[in-house]
Amino acid sequence: MTFNLDKFQIQAIDSINKDFNVLVVAPTGSGKTYIAEKAIEKYTKQNQNVIYTTPIKALSNQKYNDFTNLNIDTGLLTGDRTLKPDSELIVATTEILRNMIYSNDERLKQIGLIVLDEVHYLSDSERGTTWEEIIIHAPKNIKFLFLSATIRNKEEFHNWIVSLRGKTDLVHSNIRPVPLEISLVGLNPHNEQLKIIKSSKDKRNNKIFKFEKQYRRYKR
């Protein structure tokens, strides 16, 4: 299956091929994961491994399954699960990577690229320092691909990355290929997607749970 790439995807992939760090800010569903796939392909073809981090275990498990289904040699490190830890691509929680850096894990010698998905978590008051520590202390030879749907003050964040990691391209798109629709869906409180939303520190999600609590009171 073939499809036309969007301008921001072409720009990001071009920067990756030039061995730059890249910060991609684009709406959910716009194709950021495809950029990551092309980056993984580039580095693994050069016999360099890749670490792909997400902020929570459920999302790491999902990405592990996604990449495995693409026939990419993929391992998983979440604390709860360890699968194929010496694979070309390791999907891990952000804290796991931070611990690998501080312990001088031998596997870092084979890493050419770190993908930090949901990098806007850096502004989280409780966990944001984990992202900062990774960006500051990761070996200087490792390149970064930063992915986010929304980053406040993205230019300021970009300049900070440049000061620490060198040449970094900022790629930004406001185009939303999938229309945003607002609707109400009843979910079991143990639903995995609901857990992901609850774990977010984005204040906009407070509206969801304010409604959820009111709805539960109404049902009683």
Label each region the model flagged:
Residues 136, 143-145, 150-220:
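Conserved interdomain linker/interface between the two RecA-like ATPase lobes of SF2 helicase motors
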Residues 90, 95-96, 104-146:
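SF2 helicase catalytic motif II
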Residues 16, 44, 139:
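Conserved ATPase "switch" residues in P-loop NTPase domains
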Residues 28:
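The conserved Walker
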Residues 18-24, 48, 87-88, 142-143:
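Pre-Walker A (Motif I) flank of P-loop NTPase domains
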